[in-house]
Amino acid sequence: MPYDTMQQVIGLAPKKRGTLIQKGINFSYVPLNEEGGVDYEEAEKVLKRDQPHIVVIQRSRGYDTRQSYTVDQIKKMTAFVKKVSPESLVFVDNCYGEFSEKHEPTEYGVDFTAGSLIKNAGGGIAQTGGYIVGKEELVENAAIRLTAPGIGKEEGATLTNMHEFYEGFFLAPHTTGEAIKGMIFSAALLEKMGCEVTPKWHEPRTDLIQTIIFNVPEKMINFTKEVQKNSPIDSFVEPIPSDMPGYEDKVIMAAGNFVSGSTMEFSADGPIRPPYALYMQCGLTYAHDRIAVTNAVNHLFFKENG
């Protein structure tokens, strides 16, 4: 299934007002196989049956424990879609994945992608915004839908100064590299402490996210509090599980960041439900990631136990 908030947008939740389904846009999905990969046999049946206008691939894992999809895997998925349903467009939700590998999905047949500028592509500097990239006609179609026909991307909400977008985009590859180094260190340390982590420190990475599975809510919540405590902003604030729009379960979030809501910076969040997995993102600098995660582990695994 799509991640929680997308289920609301599509119209899979009880309230349908303003959703894609209410607007007459049909939706179907193919459950993943037991390994978290694509069930190509079932996907072929659905593609031939529906001949969809757009096939959506979510690169990152969202609030799931499957592996995020690499660019090579997306390349294979795209070739499969184009073979079975040649008229279908392929769209990739590229959030958390930009600059994590040498190549991007649009280099391998993906028609267009989108992502957030308060994640990888904004380099930790952009204050807000998102991007759409791909075939010119599709980008223009998105702009027309966002504003109005005849206006398109010539108008729209933006900041008075574009400096943050340009500088952030320039720094994004380096900042993403720092974040990935921080996650590799975190995975190695937390696995040594007995935590189940995915991906493991030595496994290939295609995004910023490090999943830590605690199996009990108490450790998950306490570790989240330690992430907040070791953040540069609002380190005195104590996160607690709370109801959030778009989610069925309570969610806990640690995000003591310079840019509100930024997951390019050191942060962690997750729904309070089994297997009590926390999704951690690091961070603007490897130096801070290493200090913060070491402090969090020290407090959770040593000081709590005397």
Swiss-Prot record:
It holds the Pfam family Met_gamma_lyase. To L.delbrueckii similar ORF in glnA 5'region. This is Uncharacterized 33.9 kDa protein in glnA 5'region. It comes from Lactobacillus delbrueckii subsp. bulgaricus.
